[in-house]
UniProtKB/Swiss-Prot annotation:
NCBIfam families: 3a0901s04IAP86. InterPro entries: G_AIG1, GIMA/IAN/Toc, P-loop_NTPase, TOC159_MAD, Toc86_159. Its cofactor is Mg(2+). Residues 284-513 form the AIG1-type G domain. Pfam families: AIG1, TOC159_MAD. Residues 20-47, 64-211, 540-585, 611-650 are annotated as: Disordered. Residues 340-343 are annotated as: G3. It comes from the Eukaryota. Residues 73-88, 574-585 have a biased composition (Basic and acidic residues). This is Translocase of chloroplast 101, chloroplastic. Binds 1 Mg(2+) ion by subunit. GTP binds at G296, V297, G298, K299, S300, A301, H413, E461, N462.
Length: 919
C-alpha cells in the first residue's frame, strides 16, 4: 500500500512539475493559449500543451506563417535558440507598409532577402538544438523577459514579438563577408569587410540619388497627366510609368514588383497632393514641338486649337504660313513652344522649294532643338502608291533618319466620313483610320530606311462644327477627346527623353542602328588570295622586246645550237593530183616529212626572233647611254607619219548565238589616242538583245620617261547590282635586277567598296632565282586589313619552274595565313609544242580551319588536236575533273555534245536526277 501511495505521489509530482514547466514556458514567450487558438489556423493549436516544447512552438509558428498571405520573398519565420525572433518577416513588411507607406518596407524587404540564406542555413541546426537541455535552460533563464508587440500591434495578437533588433543591410553584408572570409586560424579578414562596406555605401548613395530624381520625373509626369484630365489608368500614362520602372530596374539592378508599386503609389499620392495645393502654378516643364507637313493639311489650325487662341493665320484657299515662326503659349499651366513651318509640296518637281523651306527650318532649330516632331497629313486623303515618298526622303536627307525616331503622325480632318469598301458598304471608322495610318507609317519606314519604326498616330479635327462634350472639348467619332491625347503623347516623349538622359541607357545604342551597327570583319581569305597572286612587272615601250624570264636563261644554249632546218635537203611540195597518185603509206610518210619540216622551220623563226630581240636590247642600252651623255638633244618626231585609225576586230561570238547578237553596235577603231574604251560583253546577262552591260577603260603611259604606269577600270550594271573595278599601277626600277611595283585597287565586295594599296619589290638573288616581297593594306567597312607576302621563283634546267609564296593578313584582331606551291614542267620544244603540265598546292588557315587544295593541269597535242585536262581536290573531299579537246580536223567530236542532250531528255521523261530524292 505504501508502495502504491509512493508511486501515486511520484506520478502526481511528475504531473505537477510538467504543468509548472508548461505554464512557465507560456509566460516566458508571452503566448496566450486562447489568443493562439483564435489566431492560428484550425487544427494547428488545440491547447497549451501544443507549445510545451520549443520544437512544437516552432511548428505552430511555421503553420501560422504558412496561412498568411504569401510574399515575393517567401521568407518563413524561424525561431532561433540564441536569438528568439518570433515576429514573421512577411507580416512586418506588410504592417509597416500599412502604417506609414515609406521606404522602410522596401529596406526591410531587402534585409530579409539578405538574411534569407543565413536563416535557411541555420534552420537545420536550430531544429536539432531546440530539444537539447541547453536550449531548455536558455528558455528558462529568459522566462522573466517579455517582448512588446511593437509596431505590428493588434494586427498579430497571436504571435510573439522578436525581442532582438533586426540587422540592417550593411550589417548583414558585413556579417556575411566576415563568415565567408574566415581564415584558417579563425581570425576574420577585416580588409575585405571594410572595402565591401565602403562600396556598398557609395553604391547606395548614388542609387538613392538616381531614384529620387526618377521619382521626381514620375511626379512631374503624373501632374502633367492630371492637368490634361488623364488618370493613371490611361494607356499612355500606364505605358510611360511602366517604361520608367523598367528603365530603373535595368539601370539600378532588379527590384521587386512590390517596391515598384510602392514607388508609384507614393508618386501618385505626392502628385495629387501638389496639384491640390497648387493648381494654378506653372509646372517646371516646357515642350518644344516642330510642325512639318504638306500645305493645306491644317498645321496652323491645329496650333490654334491647341492654344484655344488665334495664334496663326489660317486660310482655306491658299497657304497662310510663309515663313518659319515660333509660337509660345501656356496650356493648363504648361509652357508649350511650337515651331510653325510653311507647307511642303508633294510633287517631285517642287523638291527645290521644299529644300529651301527645310533649310530655313534647319537654321531655326539650331537655336532650340525640338523635343518632338509632328508630321501632318489628312485622314481623308486616299493614297496607296507612296506618292509622298519623295517628300519624306527629302526630309530624311536634310534632317537625317533620326528625325523620325521622335515623330508623331497627326491625321487631320478626323471627322470625315469613311469611304465605301470593295463591297460597296462604307468602311467602319476604325478600319478607315487603320488603313490610312498604315499607309503613312509604311511610307515613313521606306523614307527612313528602317522597317522597325512604328510612329504613333494621333487624330485631329479643327472644324468649328465638330462635336463637343459638356466641357466644350472636341470629340472625334470614336468618342476620343483629341487635344489632351495629342499633348499627352508629346509630353510623354519629352519625359522619356529626360529619363533616358538621367539613366544613360543609350550610351552605346543608337536608334535605327541595331547593335550599334558594328563594322563587319573583312573577308580575309579573299583578300589574302589576292595578295598572294603573282603580278607582272610593267615595262617601258622600248623594253617590250626583252626576252621572257625563261628564255633569258637559255641564251648561251640557244646560240650554241645550229639551225637544223638549214641542213635539210631540198623539198618540193606535191600538188593535189600528185598526192592522189601516192599510196596510203607514201602519203603518210609525206605528211610526216612535211610536219617535221614545219616544226623545224618554226623553231628557226623562234631562234631568229630571240636573236633580234637581244640585238635590239643591246642597241637600246647603248642609246640610253648616249642620251644620258647628251641630255639636251631632243627627238624630232615631226617627220614621222601620223597614225591612221584602223578598225578593231569584233568581239568573239559566244558558242551559241543568234541574229540578235548586237556585235555590230559596238565596233570601234584603234587610234593614236592612248585611252582605250571597250564594251564589256556578258554572255549570260539578263538582256538578250544587248548583252553589253558595262564598259572597260585602259591607258598605258610613261611618267618622266622612266616610270611605266597603267590605269584600267571596269563598270558593270545589271538589274540587281553594280560592280566597280579600278586598278592603277606603276613600276620603278632602282638598280640592276630590282623593280618595285606599286598599285591602288578599288573593287566591289558585296555592297561595299574595298580600297587596296599594295607594293612589292622583285630582285634577282642568282641567275635562276628571283625573290619578291610585298605589303598591302585594304580599307573595307571602316576596318583596315594589312598583310605581307614573300615569294620565291626558281628555274631548274630548261623545263622546270617552281614558284613558292606565303603570306599573312590581319584585320580587326583576326588573322589569316596562306601559302602556295606551283611546279611547271614544259615540253622539250616549248613553246612550239605547247606541251605543259602544272601541279599546284595551296594551304590556308583562318580561325583554326585548315583548307588544303591541290590541282593538276596538263595540255598536250595529239596529232593536230589539243587536249587539256584539269583536276582539283581539297581536304573536304570535294573536287572536279574536266577534259577538253579542240581540233579543226576531227569534226566528229561534235557528237559528244549529244550526251548531255540525251541525259536531259531521259531525266525529263523518266524523272531521273534533277535533284529529286526519295524519302
Amino acid at each position: 500500500m505504501d508502495v502504491e501511495n509512493r508511486e501515486c505521489s511520484a506520478d502526481l509530482a511528475e504531473e505537477l512539475r510538467k504543468l509548472s514547466a508548461s505554464r512557465s514556458l507560456s509566460e516566458e514567450v508571452g503566448v496566450d493559449p486562447a489568443l493562439v487558438s483564435e489566431g492560428a489556423p484550425e487544427g494547428v493549436i488545440e491547447g497549451p500543451a501544443v507549445v510545451s516544447s520549443p520544437a512544437k512552438m516552432y511548428t505552430a509558428l511555421k503553420a501560422v506563417d504558412d496561412e498568411m498571405p504569401p510574399l515575393k520573398s517567401e521568407n518563413k519565420a524561424v525561431v532561433e535558440t540564441e536569438k528568439v525572433e518570433s515576429k514573421p518577416r512577411g507580416f512586418s513588411a506588410i504592417d509597416f507598409a500599412e502604417e506609414d507607406g515609406d521606404s522602410d518596407a522596401d529596406a526591410e524587404d531587402e534585409d530579409d532577402e539578405d538574411d534569407e540564406d543565413d536563416d535557411e542555413d541555420d534552420d537545420d541546426e536550430d531544429d536539432k538544438d531546440m530539444v537539447t537541455a541547453k536550449a531548455l535552460a536558455e528558455l528558462a533563464n529568459a522566462s522573466g523577459k517579455k517582448s512588446s508587440m511593437g509596431a505590428a500591434g493588434p494586427s498579430l495578437p497571436s504571435l510573439p514579438q522578436r525581442p532582438a533588433v533586426r540587422k540592417t543591410a550593411a550589417a548583414t553584408a558585413l556579417d556575411t563577408a566576415g563568415r565567408i572570409t574566415q581564415r584558417p586560424n579563425g581570425a576574420p579578414s577585416t580588409q575585405l569587410t571594410a572595402t565591401t562596406e565602403e562600396n556598398a555605401n557609395s553604391d547606395t548613395a548614388e542609387g538613392n540619388e538616381t531614384r529620387e530624381k526618377l521619382q521626381n520625373i514620375r511626379v512631374k509626369f503624373l501632374r502633367l497627366a492630371h492637368r490634361l484630365g488623364q488618370s493613371p489608368q490611361n494607356v499612355v500614362v500606364a505605358q510611360v510609368l511602366y517604361r520608367l520602372g523598367l528603365a530603373e530596374s535595368l539601370r539600378g539592378g532588379n527590384t521587386s514588383n512590390r517596391a515598384g508599386a510602392f514607388s508609384f503609389d507614393r508618386a501618385n499620392a505626392l502628385a495629387e497632393e501638389q496639384e491640390a495645393a497648387n493648381q494654378e502654378e506653372e509646372l517646371d516643364f516646357a515642350c518644344t514641338i516642330l510642325v512639318l507637313g504638306k500645305t493645306g493639311v491644317g498645321k496652323s489650325a491645329t496650333i490654334n486649337s491647341i492654344f484655344d487662341d488665334r495664334k496663326s493665320v489660317t486660310s482655306a484657299f491658299k497657304p497662310s504660313t510663309n515663313k518659319v515662326q515660333e509660337i509660345v503659349g501656356t496650356v493648363h499651366g504648361i509652357k508649350v513652344r511650337v515651331i510653325d513651318t510653311p507647307g511642303l509640296l508633294p510633287s517631285v518637281a517642287d523638291q527645290q522649294h521644299n529644300e529651301r523651306i527645310m533649310g530655313q527650318v534647319k537654321k531655326h532649330i539650331k537655336k532650340a532643338s525640338p523635343d518632338i516632331v509632328l508630321y501632318f497629313d489628312r485622314l481623308d486623303m486616299q493614297s496607296r502608291d507612296f506618292g509622298d515618298l519623295p517628300l519624306l526622303k527629302t526630309i530624311t536627307d536634310l534632317f537625317g533618319a533620326a528625325v523620325w525616331f521622335n515623330a508623331i503622325v497627326v491625321l487631320t480632318h478626323a471627322s470625315s466620313a469613311p469611304p465605301d469598301g470593295p463591297n460597296g458598304v462604307p468602311l467602319s471608322y476604325e478600319m478607315f483610320v487603320a488603313q490610312r495610318s498604315h499607309v503613312v507609317q509604311q511610307t515613313i519606314r521606306q523614307a527612313a530606311g528602317d522597317m522597325r519604326l512604328m510612329n504613333p498616330v494621333s487624330l485631329v479635327e479643327n472644324h468649328p462644327a465638330c462635336r463637343t462634350n459638356r466641357n466644350g472639348q472636341r470629340v472625334l467619332p470614336n468618342g476620343q477627346i483629341w487635344k489632351p491625347q495629342l499633348l499627352l503623347l508629346c509630353f510623354a516623349s519629352k519625359i522619356l527623353a529626360e529619363a533616358n538622359s538621367l539613366l544613360k541607357l543609350q550610351e552605346t545604342a543608337t536608334p535605327g542602328r541595331p547593335f550599334g551597327q558594328r563594322s563587319r570583319v573583312p573577308p580575309l581569305p579573299f583578300l589574302l588570295s589576292s595578295l598572294l597572286q603573282s603580278r607582272a612587272q610593267l615595262k617601258l615601250p622600248d623594253e617590250q622586246l626583252d626576252e621572257s624570264d625563261e628564255s633569258d636563261d637559255d641564251e648561251e644554249e640557244e646560240d650554241s645550237e645550229a639551225d637544223d632546218y638549214d641542213e635539210l635537203p631540198p623539198f618540193r611540195p606535191l600538188s593535189k593530183e600528185e598526192l592522189e597518185e601516192l599510196t596510203k603509206e607514201q602519203r603518210q610518210d609525206y605528211m610526216d616529212e612535211l610536219a617535221d619540216r614545219e616544226r623545224l622551220f618554226q623553231k628557226k623563226q623562234y631562234r631568229e626572233e630571240m636573236r633580234r630581240r637581244k640585238e635590239m636590247k643591246k642597241r637600246q642600252a647603248q642609246m640610253s647611254k648616249e642620251e644620258l651623255a647628251q641630255p639636251d638633244e631632243a627627238d624630232d618626231e615631226a617627220g614621222q607619219p601620223a597614225a591612221v585609225p584602223v578598225p578593231m576586230p569584233d568581239m568573239a561570238l559566244p558558242p551559241s548565238f543568234d541574229s540578235d547578237n548586237p556585235t555590230h553596235r559596238y565596233r570601234y577603231l584603234e587610234t593614236a589616242n592612248q585611252w582605250l574604251v571597250r564594251p564589256v560583253l556578258e554572255t549570260h546577262g539578263w538582256d538578250h538583245d544587248a548583252g553589253y552591260d558595262g564598259f572597260n577603260v585602259e591607258k598605258m603611259f610613261v611618267v618622266k620617261n622612266k616610270i611605266p604606269a597603267s590605269i584600267s577600270g571596269q563598270v558593270t550594271k545589271d538589274k540587281k547590282e553594280s560592280q566597280v573595278n579600278f586598278e592603277a599601277a606603276a613600276s620603278l626600277k632602282h638598280g640592276e635586277g630590282k623593280v618595285t611595283l606599286t598599285g591602288f585597287d578599288v573593287q566591289t565586295i558585296g555592297k561595299d567598296l574595298a580600297y587596296t594599296l599594295r607594293a612589292e619589290t622583285r630582285f634577282n638573288n642568282f641567275k635562276r632565282n628571283k625573290t619578291t616581297a610585298g605589303v598591302t593594306a585594304t580599307y573595307l567597312n571602316d576596318t583596315i586589313a594589312a598583310g605581307v607576302k614573300l615569294e620565291d621563283r626558281i628555274l631548274i634546267g630548261k623545263r622546270v619552274k617552281m614558284v613558292v609564296n606565303g603570306g599573312v593578313l590581319t584585320g580587326k584582331g583576326d588573322k589569316a595565313f596562306g601559302g602556295s606551291l606551283e611546279a611547271t614542267l614544259r615540253g622539250k620544244e616549248y613553246p612550239l609544242s605547247r606541251t605543259l603540265s602544272t601541279l599546284g598546292l595551296s594551304v590556308m588557315d583562318w580561325h583554326g580551319d585548315l583548307a588544303i587544295g591541290g590541282n593538276l593541269q596538263s595540255q598536250f597535242m595529239v596529232g593536230k588536236t589539243m587536249m587539256v585536262g584539269r583536276a582539283n581536290l581539297n581536304n573536304r573531299g570535294s573536287g572536279q575533273v574536266s577534259i577538253r579537246a579542240s581540233s579543226s580536223e576531227q569534226l566528229q567530236m561534235v557528237l559528244i555534245g549529244i550526251v548531255p542532250i540525251l541525259r536531259s531528255l531521259i531525266n525529263c521523261r523518266f524523272g531521273f536526277g534533277g535533284g529529286q530524292s526519295s524519302q
